[in-house]
Swiss-Prot record:
Record has Hydrolase as a keyword: yes
Listed name of the protein: Probable 2-phosphosulfolactate phosphatase
Alphabetic keyword roster: Hydrolase, Magnesium
NCBIfam families with a match to the protein in the record: PRK00886.1-2
Gene of this entry: comB
Record field: catalytic activity: (2R)-O-phospho-3-sulfolactate + H2O = (2R)-3-sulfolactate + phosphate
Length: 243
């Protein structure tokens, strides 16, 4: 199994056809998706476009839906929730369809929505995702970071390295790094693995969240390694369910 990592969706070659893709947006979309599905959400439906989100949500019963969204780290006006993983409690989300749009993560999902096996990962479900990928045995898996507005993000590379490290560890003879970006991400993980929260806080997006207000609970949640067994899996374009 070849494992590639792309810092942002635009770096993934248009002609690349991986068997599997794993999208990462540690701060905070893929952490929130994992937490929401773990807490009983019926599904998370991701949108790059707010217009498309509102149109799709309007067709869903009001008592069975929630609108989640942020731009620049701040909750969107008229939405039920922002992009905080600690806000998607069982009381809030159980049984509901979550219509979600964020600055970076949902756009990354849109880029790889045609890949046969599409998963999302964060630090809390790293082990579960690694085990699922290995069970499927794709010949090539692309780990895709969301970045920040098209640029590199430290925290996504940390999580990509955590996932890549675990895949290589679990399958040392059958898996290999397909690009230097993955090798560098694994090295980054080895540097910060004893204190991933410190890395998240050091990252420019972490600093951005700190400036916006008290996000200590979000940082703790996003940095918690291997705490969730849920694997968000695309079941139809843009729709993720627990698996």
């Amino acid at each position: 199994m070849q494992i590639s990592y792309f810092h942002v969706p635009a770096e993934m070659p248009q002609d690349l056809r991986p068997d599997a893709a794993v999208v990462i947006d540690v701060l905070r979309a893929t952490t929130t998706i994992a937490r929401a599905l773990h807490n009983g959400a019926e599904a998370v439906q991701a949108f790059a476009s707010l217009e498309d989100l509102r149109a799709a949500a309007a067709e869903w019963p009001a008592d069975a839906r929630l609108l989640l969204g942020e731009r620049g780290g701040q909750m969107l006006e008229g939405f039920d929730l922002g992009n905080s993983p600690v806000a998607v409690t069982p009381e809030q989300v159980a049984g509901k369809r979550l219509f979600m749009s964020t600055t970076n993560g949902t756009r990354a999902l849109d880029r790889v929505r045609e890949v046969p096996l599409l998963l999302t990962a964060a630090l809390p479900n790293r082990e579960a995702v690694a085990q699922r990928v290995l069970a499927k045995q794709p010949s090539h898996v692309a780990i895709v970071g969301s970045g920040w507005e098209g640029a590199y993000s430290l925290e996504d590379s940390l999580a990509a390295g955590a996932l890549g490290h675990r895949l290589l560890e679990l399958d040392p003879t059958g898996s290999s790094a397909a690009n230097d970006e993955l090798t560098a991400a694994v090295s980054l993980w080895r540097q910060w693995q004893s204190d991933p929260e410190a890395c998240l806080r050091t990252a420019t997006h972490g600093q951005r969240l700190i400036r916006l207000g008290d996000h200590d609970a979000d940082f703790r949640c996003c940095a918690g390694l291997d705490q969730l067994g849920v694997v968000p899996t695309q079941v139809e374009p843009g729709v993720l369910r627990a698996a």
